[in-house]
Amino acid sequence: MTNTQVTLVQLDNYGPWTVTPSPRREVDLQTLQSRLYADLSQAIGTRDGYVFFTRFDNMIAVTNGLDLEAHARVQESIRNRYPITASLSIGTGSTPADALVGATGALQQQGSAQDADRRETLLGQPIPDAERTDDDVQIAHFDVIDATGTYTDELDAFASFTHIEAGYAALMRHMHDAHDSLSFFVGGDNIIAVCPGLSDGDYEDAIAHVQDTADVALRVGVGRGASAHDAGMGAKHALEVAREHDTIVERSGRQ
């Protein structure tokens, strides 16, 4: 069984801030969001976590191994470097979806995302070190089979993008609804899913669903570890094995 720790990062009162005292330039907002995501990715990544941009004003991180002090440092860094603040809510559970539901619900109980009085809330309890194991996190790294030959070198850039996004949307919904997993597009033709302990058959079914629904062919590498970094690197190596052997599901060390 997995034991995933998920942190919801929600920018405080961000919508109203973008139009106060008057609407801000879109290019400035996009620049702020991308820089903030990059800084968060670095800050959480140095502690072996993963963060996904999701909607930018609401980001989702896998934070196994990060304690409350580490979360507070992240908040302090945002406050010191940006004209906005962020609330963080930690949830844990046997599935990533359950962990996120808990984190989201706790933050919603503190007030609206656009509540001017709710600032830098820090909620939830991380998994105690004594309860952590080397198998707490399962990461699945999907990519599109021959994306370059099928899309990039054959279609215009936007058509390629829409095909890959259609595959991502189909996978995201299926993995969440069928397996309580959280899947994120991470650029190129890559999708990272944070999963409970799924079988090879579960992944094969997901790949078949995307093929049938979106006509996009996927393969996947799967890894497990004590942190998102450990599991993610295992998944990357497994994906390389799948590419070399022309298979659709491989696991790091055949876990």
From Swiss-Prot:
InterPro entries per the UniProt record, alphabetical: GTP_CycHdrlase_3 (IPR007839), Nucleotide_cyclase (IPR029787), Rev_trsase/Diguanyl_cyclase (IPR043128)
Highest taxon listed in the record's lineage: Archaea
EC number(s) reported in the record: 3.5.4.29
Gene Ontology BP, a term: biosynthetic process
Intrachain disulfide bonds: none
UniProt record similarity statement: Belongs to the archaeal-type GTP cyclohydrolase family.
Keyword Nucleotide-binding: yes
Alphabetic keyword roster: GTP-binding, Hydrolase, Nucleotide-binding
Function: Catalyzes the formation of 2-amino-5-formylamino-6-ribofuranosylamino-4(3H)-pyrimidinone ribonucleotide monophosphate and inorganic phosphate from GTP. Also has an independent pyrophosphate phosphohydrolase activity.
Name recorded for this polypeptide: GTP cyclohydrolase III 1
Sample GO molecular function, one term: GTP cyclohydrolase IIa activity
Gene3D superfamilies: 3.30.70.270, Nucleotide cyclase
Reactions the enzyme catalyzes: GTP + 3 H2O = 2-amino-5-formylamino-6-(5-phospho-D-ribosylamino)pyrimidin-4(3H)-one + 2 phosphate + 2 H(+)
Keyword NAD applies: no
Residue runs in coiled coils: none
Signal peptide: none
